[in-house]
């Protein structure tokens, strides 16, 4: 069963920027209630889009450099990267349909 990949400040470039697939990045923290609410949705997307999309999670508390680089001010923040560039951002615990529609735009 596919699940999101945990990335760090050190693995972000390899896993996200250099990925040949579309990448959904979930910026989260363990103390964040809305992050915990959206986590099952992220897990479902990881299963449904296993062939087309790489889904990664980055803990903002443990990885402040990447969070600062991308201007993360509130969490959860979800960003889509295509060909190494950020192409879309969704902030907050949104419905699965919102994320699905965002993914479909770039597939």
Curated annotation (Swiss-Prot):
UniProt name for this protein: Thioredoxin
Repeat as UniProt keyword: no
Disulfide pattern: 32-35
Record's GO cellular component terms: chloroplast
Organism: Cyanidium caldarium (Red alga)
GO MF terms held by the record: protein-disulfide reductase activity
Keyword Lipid biosynthesis belongs to the record: no
Annotated site (Deprotonates C-terminal active site Cys): 26
Annotated active site: 32, 35
Gene3D superfamilies: Glutaredoxin
Annotated Pfam families: Thioredoxin
Alphabetized SUPFAM superfamilies for the sequence: Thioredoxin-like
Keywords, alphabetical: Chloroplast, Disulfide bond, Electron transport, Plastid, Redox-active center, Transport
Function text: Participates in various redox reactions through the reversible oxidation of its active center dithiol to a disulfide and catalyzes dithiol-disulfide exchange reactions.
The Thioredoxin domain, residue ranges: 2-107
Localization per record: Plastid, Chloroplast
InterPro entries recorded: Thioredoxin (IPR005746), Thioredoxin-like_sf (IPR036249), Thioredoxin_CS (IPR017937), Thioredoxin_domain (IPR013766)
Domain of life: Eukaryota
Gene (name only): trxA
Site feature (Contributes to redox potential value) residues: 33-34
Protein family (similarity comment): Belongs to the thioredoxin family.
